[in-house]
Amino acid sequence: MKLKFSVIAVVLMTVYGVSKAQEDNVWKKLTGVTYEVGEDEYGELYLPVFSEDIQELEGTEVSAEGYIIPFEGMFKPEHIILSSLPLAECFFCGSGGPETVMEVMMADPIEYTSKRVKVKGTLKLNAKDPEKLMYILTDAELVL
């Protein structure tokens, strides 16, 4: 009986560990994007080409930790931009690439904070609409 309990405990801890590792590595997976040059009515643009690992995440619930980008006068508590990098290094302000940010559509409004936050929602990939970011999290909830 004791051995059976030990085996079950090890299996549960392993499953939790794998799940937690995948959750923590979502930003790492999202860096597996490449680009191809395309054109629209305004000229050349770079279109994302998502790796198989990224495509497998589409439509699944993922968690992402990061920093809310504070667009002055534009912060909407139900629609935020989340950066995997601190503000000084983010895509809009520093050296990060477009794969380091995602649009997050919150299920409930949140308050702005300069501290790191964690959100959970359904990942959508965007390769066609240049007015939106390529990663969009919908029905998101604040976890931390």
In which residue ranges do the predicted regions lie?
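Sec-dependent N-terminal signal peptides
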Residues: 5-15
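OB-fold and OB-like single-stranded nucleic-acid-recognition modules
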Residues: 20-144
